């Protein structure tokens, strides 16, 4: 297995108990679970039940497979993916005020962007992107759940008529204005269980 079998009751019963119950004699584990409720307890439970346990096989590859989980539990922050599109002459955008987005993506890359959105818990943009592109930041060209939308609107100047505020997906706005009537702390992101952010 890529990750140490759990030894506690969460959303499901302990995986270690099932392995013991099914009398699996040898367990090969890629990496230890950094989650505080497991953190070696699953391995110990298996050993105490007389099972042979080998830990660290293809550990680097296993950690890469579960990098979002590892980042969340070791660094106490979301796994962040940076995404941008640029033209062949290395431009990201041109000066404009018309609210029409610059299309730099092909239909295939657009689909892949929506796939990435579906794989992330939240997506973040700044004020200028919100104003100029009026993006929905939802999942349309792929299947899956749309991420929570996060907007950095320092002066709280965005129009409530933007697609970001259509109510179809939760939107969090971060501002510098004291006592702003909007969620402004990281605890709101934790409440939404945002563990993977696309920026």
Question: Where do the PLM segments sit?
Answer:
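Glycine-rich nucleotide phosphate-binding loop and flanking beta-alpha elements
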Residues: 7, 35, 130-131, 158, ...
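Structural motif corresponding to alpha-helix initiation and N-cap regions
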Residues: 12-13, 40, 59, 63-67, ...
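Alpha-helical scaffold segments in soluble metabolic enzymes
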Residues: 18, 45, 64, 68, ...
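Short secondary-structure boundary/hinge segments and terminal tails
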Residues: 37, 63-65, 133-135
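Zn2+-dependent cytidine deaminase-like catalytic core
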Residues: 1-61, 148, 176-177
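Active-site ligand-binding patch in enzyme domains
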Residues: 71, 79-190
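Single conserved hydrophobic/aromatic residue that forms the stacking wall/gate
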Residues: 188-199
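Flexible, polar/acidic helix-loop-strand segments at domain edges
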Residues: 66-76
């Amino acid at each position: 297995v890529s990750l140490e079998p759990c030894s506690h009751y969460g959303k499901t019963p302990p995986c270690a108990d099932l392995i013991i119950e099914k009398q699996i004699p040898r367990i090969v584990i890629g990496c230890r679970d950094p989650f505080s409720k497991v953190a070696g307890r699953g391995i110990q439970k298996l050993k105490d039940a007389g099972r042979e346990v080998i830990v660290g096989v293809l550990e680097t590859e296993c950690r890469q497979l579960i990098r979002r989980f590892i980042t969340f539990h070791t660094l106490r922050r979301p796994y962040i993916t940076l995404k941008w599109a640029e033209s062949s002459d290395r431009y990201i955008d041109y000066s404009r005020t018309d609210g029409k987005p610059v299309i730099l993506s092909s239909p295939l890359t657009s689909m892949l962007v929506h796939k990435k959105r579906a794989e992330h818990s939240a997506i973040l943009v700044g004020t200028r992107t919100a104003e100029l592109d009026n993006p929905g930041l939802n999942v349309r060209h792929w299947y899956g759940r749309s991420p929570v939308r996060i907007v950095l609107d320092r002066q709280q100047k965005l129009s409530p008529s933007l697609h970001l505020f259509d109510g179809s997906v939760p939107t969090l706005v971060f501002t510098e204005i004291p006592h702003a009537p909007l969620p402004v702390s990281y605890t709101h992101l934790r409440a939404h269980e945002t563990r993977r952010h696309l920026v």
